[in-house]
């Protein structure tokens, strides 16, 4: 990952919910590592969902969403981000490539399905199936997150998405 705002640099927004030191934070760090490892000129804006807003979403050329599963749903912080940004960006973010990663105590499908339904309203383009990490975070799960970050970075840089 490179810093700066050169026009050739692709821009990824990574938003996430969860608690400091939690499993989702471990996954976020791995996704960031994957983006950083890319040879492509990428600018990453990584923010807790409660701090991200309309300007961040309009800035993004790719979106990664990390959330814990809370009671079979996405985190309140991620839902709040979507509630605050939907109408202000309506009609302005169609086709935005996105992917989701979820730390789940259950099966994670409720959170994944809810985000997918909302993404249809935004008219985003899903670039990968939801990455659901059930239970403890393993090295294999971290590797999948690294690969998700690399996929987004490479896909944007190569014009695939």
Language-model regions: role of each:
Residues 2-36:
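N-terminal beta1-alpha1 ligand-phosphate binding loop
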Residues 13, 43-45, 99:
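A structural signal for isolated positions on well-ordered beta-strands in alpha/beta enzyme cores
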Residues 18-21, 103-107, 132-138:
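Short histidine/acidic/glycine/proline-rich micro-motifs that form metal-
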Residues 24-27, 77, 111, 141-144:
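Residues at alpha-helix caps and immediate loop-helix transition turns in enzyme cores, especially N-
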Residues 28-41, 120-125:
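Short helix-loop-beta junction
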Residues 40-51:
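A short beta-strand-loop structural module common to alpha/beta enzyme folds
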